[in-house]
Amino acid sequence: MKSFNLLSLSLLLAIASAAAVPDVEGTITNDAATPVNNLDDKRDHCGQVCLNKTGCGGKCPKCDMRSLTCKKA
């Protein structure tokens, strides 16, 4: 049982230390996974959900308040 506790503790420490590694200069980060970038990318598509007149842009700048979707002007 003692060896199991030691093994599980060392595994836990290995996972925690791997998660705490800072970003290394020169590596590529995946910014596309951030919600802000996803929203900016989707602003250009028709049919996205909008809640006000400023929620749409690009090819479909008009927000139809009945269906709450962006449509072409």
From Swiss-Prot:
What domain of life? Eukaryota
Q: Where in the cell is it found?
A: Secreted
Q: Among the entry's GO cellular component annotations, what is one?
A: extracellular region
What keywords sit in the KW lines?
Disulfide bond, Knottin, Secreted, Signal
Q: Which cysteines are joined by disulfide bonds?
A: 46-60, 50-63, 56-70
Kindly indicate whether the keyword Secreted belongs to this entry: yes
Q: Its family?
A: Belongs to the UPF0499 family.
What does the domain comment read? Answer: The presence of a 'disulfide through disulfide knot' structurally defines this protein as a knottin.
Name of this chain's protein: UPF0499 protein NFIA_054990
